[in-house]
A protein has these predicted regions:
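Nucleotide phosphate-binding/pyrophosphate-handling subdomain across enzymes
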Residues: 1-104
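C-terminal helical cap/extension that packs against the catalytic core
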Residues: 6, 17, 51-53, 95-157
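Short helix-capping segments at alpha-helix termini
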Residues: 23, 74-75, 128-132, 179
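Active-site-proximal loop/hinge segments that shape catalytic or ion-binding/gating pockets
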Residues: 164
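Short, active-site-adjacent cap segments at secondary-structure transitions
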Residues: 167-169
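Nuclease catalytic cores that cleave nucleic-acid phosphodiester bonds
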Residues: 176
C-alpha cells in the first residue's frame, strides 16, 4: 500500500479511538477492518504474468505517491502506462512525476464527462513535449489504449492505469472477467 493510504488509515484509527467512549469497537475489529479495506482503483493490483496496477492518481500529489510505490516495487520487466485525464487536471505535472518510472506510454482520450473530458490529441498537446524522448502512442479511448498495452506487454511487465476515476473505471470494465 502507498504511504498516503497508511496515513489515511492512521487518521481513521485516531478518529475511531476518539469515539471509543461512544462506540464499542475492539482493537481486533479495527485491525481486521484495516486489513480488509479495499477501494477499487486505488493502488489495486491485479496479479498475473503481466501485473496490472490501477490507481486513480488524478493530481500531481497522487501521481507522486504512485511514483514512490513504483520505485519501491519494480517489475522484472517494463512499466507500461495507460494514462487519460480530465481536461482541467494538471496533466503535465502528473506525467512529470512518473516519467522516471514509466518505460512506455499509452495515452488515451476520455469521453466528454460533464464538459471535462478531452480527446487524446488535446492530452498530447499538453504532455507531448515531456514524452518526446519516450515511446508514446495515442489512442481514442482507454479501452483501446489498454488493449494496445496488453498486446505489447510481455511476462514480467506491468501495466499501470492512472489519471482519473473515469480512466480506472473504463479499464476495470474492460478487465471485468480478469478483475
Amino acid at each position: 500500500r502507498a504511504p498516503a493510504q497508511l496515513a489515511n488509515a492512521s487518521a481513521a484509527i485516531a478518529a475511531l479511538r476518539a469515539l471509543l467512549p461512544v462506540l464499542a469497537i475492539s482493537d481486533a475489529a479495527i485491525a481486521d477492518g484495516v486489513r480488509s479495506a479495499r477501494l477499487a482503483g486505488r493502488m489495486q493490483v491485479l496479479p498475473g504474468p503481466v501485473e496490472i496496477v490501477l490507481d486513480v492518481a488524478h493530481n500531481p500529489q497522487a501521481a507522486q505517491q504512485l511514483a514512490v510505490w513504483l520505485g519501491a516495487n519494480r517489475p522484472r520487466g517494463a512499466n507500461l502506462a495507460v494514462f487519460a485525464a480530465l481536461a482541467d487536471k494538471d496533466v503535465a505535472n502528473e506525467v512529470a512525476a512518473l516519467m522516471a518510472h514509466i518505460d512506455l506510454w499509452y495515452l488515451a482520450g476520455l469521453a466528454d464527462v460533464g464538459g471535462r473530458g478531452q480527446p487524446v490529441e488535446q492530452l498530447w498537446q499538453k504532455v507531448g513535449s515531456l514524452l518526446s524522448r519516450s515511446l508514446a502512442t495515442r489512442h481514442a479511448t482507454v479501452v483501446q489504449a489498454l488493449a494496445a498495452a496488453r498486446k505489447s506487454a510481455r511476462a514480467g511487465d506491468r501495466i499501470v492505469v492512472f489519471g482519473s476515476f473515469h480512466t480506472v473505471g473504463e479499464a476495470l470494465a474492460a478487465l471485468a472477467p480478469a478483475a
